[in-house]
Amino acid sequence: MRFVRMGMFVTAVALGAGFAIAAPATTDSAARKELKRADLSGAPNMEVIASITELKPGDEFPRHLHHGVEAGYVVQGGMIQNPGQAPSMLATGAPIFNLRDAPHAGYKVIGPGNIILFTTHVVDKGKPLYDWVK
């Protein structure tokens, strides 16, 4: 068995999916680095995508949704601010879980350090990973 980072392994096992070798470039977000992508076993129209997103102070993470489930965790937390709200802490180690077609994010990173997110998406194949929400 190949060496797999513990976080990826736990997430993959929890979702019942294995990952492929290919890691194509992304065009949906400059902050997201795709790590692995594979078809979801037993579901021919779905795929599993593992990614790392790194957001720097001043970056905005636009409001968006996915055509499937997003699960993961905050590898490195930091201060964020949603429009019209007081700053809040996105805590290191916090879980990430967003249901199909549920709008989320829409915040600005206010620092002082970078925020790093590990995510696994189980989504409809052939659809964009992100649909931006106004």
Model-inferred region functions:
Residues 38, 55-57, 79-80, 95, ...:
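Extracytoplasmic low-complexity repetitive segments enriched in small/polar residues
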Residues 46, 58-73:
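A short beta-loop-beta micro-motif enriched in histidine and acidic residues
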Residues 63, 81-82, 98, 104-111:
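Short beta-strand His + acidic residue motifs that chelate non-heme Fe in jelly-roll/DSBH
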Residues 67-85, 92-94:
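Glycine- and acidic-residue-biased ligand/ion/polar-headgroup-sensing regions
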Residues 102-126:
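Ligand-binding loop in jelly-roll beta-barrel domains
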Residues 40-42, 55-56, 84-102:
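Short acidic-glycine-tyrosine-enriched beta hairpin
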Residues 63, 71-73, 95-98, 117-119:
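Structural recognition of the beta-strand scaffold that forms the well-ordered cores
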Residues 2-52, 96-97, 130-134:
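A short, N-terminal "cap"/entry segment at the start of jelly-roll beta-barrel domains
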